[in-house]
Amino acid sequence: MQKVILVGKPNVGKSSLFNRLARRRIAITSDVSGTTRDTNKAKIEVEGKECILIDSGGLDDSSELFKNVKAKTLAEAKNSDVILYMVDGKMMPDDEDRAIFYELSKLNLPIALVINKIDSKKDEQREWEFVNFGSKNSFGISVSHNTGVDELSIWLAKHLEEKVQIKADTSDDFDDFLENYNDEGELSDEIDYESKNIRVGIIGRVNVGKSSLLNALVKESRAVVSDVAGTTIDPVNEIYEHDGRVFEFVDTAGIRKRGKIEGIERYALNRTEKILEETDVALLVLDSSEPLTELDERIAGIASKFELGVIIVLNKWDKSSEEFDELCKEIKDRFKFLSYAPIISVSALGGKRVHKIYPLIVEIYKNYTQKIQTSKLNEVIGEATKAHPLPRDKGRVVKIYYAVQFKTAPIMIALIMNRPKCLHFSYKRYLTNKLRESFSLTGVPIVLIPKKRGESDEDKEQ
């Protein structure tokens, strides 16, 4: 699929145009210069033709970080098919903008000069100030007023290939669940998890090495890596194929202490949570060179909150196996709610042991999406209740009639009971442990939901 890249200095409106063309808010927009530090990607349709739209980091030489962004942006432009170079129509053209535009023009790719913030008839006169760029294709637009964007879209469509009709999957396995169960009482096989992309969110506090880990996983310098805390603001998307499986990685914004979350980063935190709602497996990155913090524990709680498959990644590891065992014990003690999560040590910058993450992701995804046979499930539950009967409720017998899995990703199991409100959390934990002993459930949560006979899923009781 062809790639279209948006290039320009910070705060000229690239992210706003990106959101306008994508018809949804993907990139974070702000009046703060340089909000987009990493490249964002989205598949869009322009006049019936599909392409990948790339929102690059702002070009600015005012700091070392933005020099890195500039180098990455220019490299990304060379691998694109169409370039949209964006400038601020309310500012005077400068030599640097012209120099970069000339440099990009040498690539012999279709390139348009997009003059943003032409918000009125008076502003239209400013377009003439950019004549010395020598652009054959100039468009005065106002993203905020949505003027001129249609003309730009028509030009863009002329330089895109015809939309390719992708053959539909031969099965109908991508429909929604059919009433959750089939006639035999088993969970319906309506979703083909084997062919779906595995969505992986990389989470952790600022500067623990999330971007370095993403770069190591996809074997290229993708996210901007810097010692400046909080470099990644936009969640960074990367689609990568490994051993026949497609992985969608998202490097989420680093999370700071609550008191330090301000403005744009608060929005980034909200975006992070929204992304985790759509994630299958979370890579919780910890900095092994520093002591565990309360914030680490809070972030781990986010993964638990969204009931994701989880791998705990100890980054910057250069210690002995004995020290690894000690730290694992500390993590298990601090993160009791993630006791099911495997722990792996890596050095993202050096690429050490990073390759071991892929098979772990695949294993956990398989566990996360598995369907447990109802007969086997009830066999385990029956043996567990026989070995350790449920406590009575004020002398009254508490029974589990049967259990059935009604959802995958995460695994949700309904316990059909006579007194669902009387199931103590400690007995839930006991049943969960028994299920883990009997089935492959490494790295994934198990949600047990006690329900009264005839109770609907909407009335489920946590």
UniProtKB/Swiss-Prot annotation:
Q: Which GO terms describe its biological process?
A: ribosome biogenesis
Which PROSITE patterns did the record assign?
G_ENGA
Annotated residues for binding of GTP 2:
204-211, 251-255, 315-318
Q: Which residues form the KH-like domain?
A: 370-454
> Function of this protein?
GTPase that plays an essential role in the late steps of ribosome biogenesis.
Which family does the record claim for this protein?
Belongs to the TRAFAC class TrmE-Era-EngA-EngB-Septin-like GTPase superfamily. EngA (Der) GTPase family.
> Quaternary state and partners of this protein?
Associates with the 50S ribosomal subunit.
Its recorded name reads GTPase Der
Organism, per UniProt?
Campylobacter concisus (strain 13826)
Q: What is the lineage of its organism?
A: Bacteria, Pseudomonadati, Campylobacterota, Epsilonproteobacteria, Campylobacterales
Q: Which gene encodes it?
A: der
